[in-house]
Amino acid sequence: PHPALVLHHDPSPAVCTSAIVDRHLGGVHRAWAVVGAFGDNLDETAAALARTLDLDATSVAALKRLGECLNYNAYGDSVDELLVHPVELLRRMAGFARPADFAAAEPVFAQIDRAMQDDIVCAHALAPIDADAAVACFELPDAAWSRRVSGAFANRLARANPRRAHAV
């Protein structure tokens, strides 16, 4: 490894990269860490981080929505299937210290949010190919929208039925 490389690792299932970076930076950009944790479906971790920011419920819900949208935009077989190329999205986000300002100012957020909601509706319209109290299996069509929504859909299934395994 490079002599300047410093590794930060936490194997806890309740810790994501955003939480590790937040810890390393001493919470300087904690609102972005909240967004990242929500995007990774670590709602309890995100909520704990958000409590340190003294945010109201509406603000926390907005950070959750942004995290889910950014996560949704990361799914696809190739960057061509994404709504916004990751480099372009990073370029747009980089100018904002606060995620709420990004969400309010950048029309790309509304574009991603609208597409995610449309795709979630399509995914929820599908019946599982097999389901019981312990497991539910969903087969999504071979289409870009279904690859984009697979993570968001799986996360929602897991949140709605935490005692049941889900295959998407």
Where are these regions (language model features)?
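Accessory alpha-helical/coil subdomains and C-terminal extensions
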Residues: T45-A125
